[in-house]
Each structure stands twice: as C-alpha cells, then as structure tokens.
Amino acid sequence: MSFSLDELAASLGATVQGDAGLIVKSIAPLDQAGADQLAFLSNPLYLNQAVTSGAGAIIVSPRDLETLTAEGHAAGRNWLVAANPYAAFARIAQRFAALGARPAAAGIHPSASVGEGAVVPASCSIGPNVTIEAGAVLGERVRIAGNSFIGADAQVGDDTLLYANVSIYHGCVVGARCILHSGVVIGADGFGFAPDFGPQGGEWVKIPQTGRAIVGDDVEIGANTAIDRGAMADTVVEQGCKIDNQVQIAHNVHVGAYTVIAGCAAISGSTKIGRYCIIGGAANFAGHLTIADRVTVSGGTSITKSIPKPGHFTSVFPFMPHADWERNAAILRGLTRMRERLQQLEQQVKHLQQSS
C-alpha cells in the first residue's frame, strides 16, 4: 500500500523536485506527517507549517515552491509540484483509498427481493433486505447496501454505490458512478397542494406528482437529502453535482452541472440553478427563480429574486454579541420614523436655503 513520488507525478502530470524514488505510504496533515507520508500545501497561510513539517514529501504549487526556495527552505526536501495541490491531494487520496478498499462480493443476498422483469446484472452486489421492484434496471457493478429500495421502472447506472436505507422511487433515474449516502430519497412527491377554501372552510387538494427525479452521472448526495419528483415535468440534477447532507431539492428544480450545495440548503419548486454554482450551508431559494452559472451564495443567505449574472451574493447579517444585536434590532425597528424625520429636516433645510 505505497507509491513512489515519480509514480504519483506521472498519474497527475506533476513534477518531482528531490528524490523521485521516495516511497510514501499514506497522506497526512502538514503538522502531523512523518517521513513515509505525503502532505499537501494548498494555502500560503500554511507556509510556516510546510517549513517545519516532518513529511517525506509535500504537494506544492510552483508559486509556493518559489517562495520556499527564495527563503532558503526548499533545498534538501522532496516536493511534488502540481498546478492545483488541493486537487492533486484529492486524486492521490483516492488512489490510497482504493488500495485499502474491500471489494463488494457480486451477488444477491437471499433476503433481497427482486421483482419480475427487473434487470440485475451478475456483476451487481445487492445487500440484505433490499427491494428491487418490477421493471427496474441496474447497470453493471452497481452496489446496493442493506434495506435500500429501488422502485418500479427506476434506473441506476453503472458503478453507482447506494449505502444503506436509500430509496429511489418508481420511474426515477440515477446515473453512472454516483454515490448516494444513507437516508437519501430520490423521487418522493413534491409539495404540491391546491387551495380550495371558501367562507365555510375547505381543504388543500393534493396535486399528483407525475414527473420524475433525474440524477446525472458522477453525482454524490449526502445523508438524508431529498430530491422530489416533478409535478408534471422532471426534477433534474445534472452531472458532476456534489450535494451535502440534509438538503431539500423541491419539485421541478433544475440544478446545473458541477454545482455544489452544502448542508441544510433548501431550493423551492421550479427554481433553476446554473452550472458551477457554489451554494453555502442553510442557504434558501424562493420558488420559480433563475440563477446564472458560476454564482456563489454564502451560507444562510435567502435568495428571493433571480440572479442574472455571476457573482458572490450574501444576505446574512454578521454575527455580534447578543446585546449589540438587540440594540441594532431596536434601531432597525425605528428606521421608518428616522426616515420620516430625515425628510422633514431636509425640507426645513431647503426652506431655510430658499429664504436666505
């Protein structure tokens, strides 16, 4: 379970400065790494840690290596030089993880239930108490852990991994090489009810949700996230998206490719999120909005209008000591009166100027 630096460099298109034959056995943080471990420097704020690190080698950018060299700290050390050290670290970490992974045995557990006409290739691994309903189609090497549910006519692409207790409702589609963590629900009914109330009362009338939820290739979805099916058209999450735990994606939402969404965010129905967006934790979006490509939304922000062009958007009031917040809140409550008073003063000044 080890790699040489030149082997890692070749896989990344990186270069080695120092001993290219050095063998590293794992990756560790700069301040904890030992002589047989690889660390990474992706933020120049940690240059001092790189100087004192005991790592056998460090992944570094050309610019940071220039700084270390100019300060006399690079000589006699081993450096794996990559344009994007953080991405290089991630890819190397994947290689080490693959070395230690225990492959799932192909086959269907005796307690699993497979419906009539379902397609389950021999290369798939189906865990205990899994239900695969009639007409569902799995790709090659799909792994489904215990107690998961695949609804009728649903589709799951090649090499996708479903952890325990994942539910994919009828007719929904999950692409290839996806990872769905425990508790994910794909294709539950969207929150659709028509009000029918009069003077004597009434009720909320359920709107059947007849669309699907479609998840593209290479998507990872965190634990207990829900992606609802569309009311009539489909809910879509395009390829390469990464979605954190406990995120709500409502019916008819469309999330563009390679967008990332942090935990507890909520996107209301029929909103369209562009490609390459970054959505912070607990951000929330009103319904029927359109968000441009490459928009960043800070955590906790409420988006109530469409965003037509790229940029970074924040609506969160900065935190402060509670007593200060209470004083500021009291001032905010009086803003209308203050505005009216200011207008009166402006009129008085204008009158005095005209009289002089």
UniProtKB/Swiss-Prot annotation:
Q: What protein name does the entry list? A: UDP-3-O-acylglucosamine N-acyltransferase
One GO MF term, please? Answer: N-acyltransferase activity
Keyword list, A-Z = Acyltransferase, Lipid A biosynthesis, Lipid biosynthesis, Lipid metabolism, Repeat, Transferase
Enzyme Commission numbers on file: 2.3.1.191
Upper classification of the source organism reads: Bacteria, Pseudomonadati, Pseudomonadota, Betaproteobacteria, Burkholderiales
Q: Which reaction does it catalyse?
A: a UDP-3-O-[(3R)-3-hydroxyacyl]-alpha-D-glucosamine + a (3R)-hydroxyacyl-[ACP] = a UDP-2-N,3-O-bis[(3R)-3-hydroxyacyl]-alpha-D-glucosamine + holo-[ACP] + H(+)
Active site as annotated: H251
Q: Give the GO biological process terms.
A: lipid A biosynthetic process
Where does the chain cross the membrane?
none
Supply one GO CC term from the record.
membrane
Query: What's the subunit arrangement here?
Result: Homotrimer.
Protein family membership: Belongs to the transferase hexapeptide repeat family. LpxD subfamily.
Q: Which Pfam family is an annotated match for this chain, by its short name? A: Hexapep
UniProt pathway annotation: Bacterial outer membrane biogenesis; LPS lipid A biosynthesis
Function, as annotated: Catalyzes the N-acylation of UDP-3-O-acylglucosamine using 3-hydroxyacyl-ACP as the acyl donor. Is involved in the biosynthesis of lipid A, a phosphorylated glycolipid that anchors the lipopolysaccharide to the outer membrane of the cell.
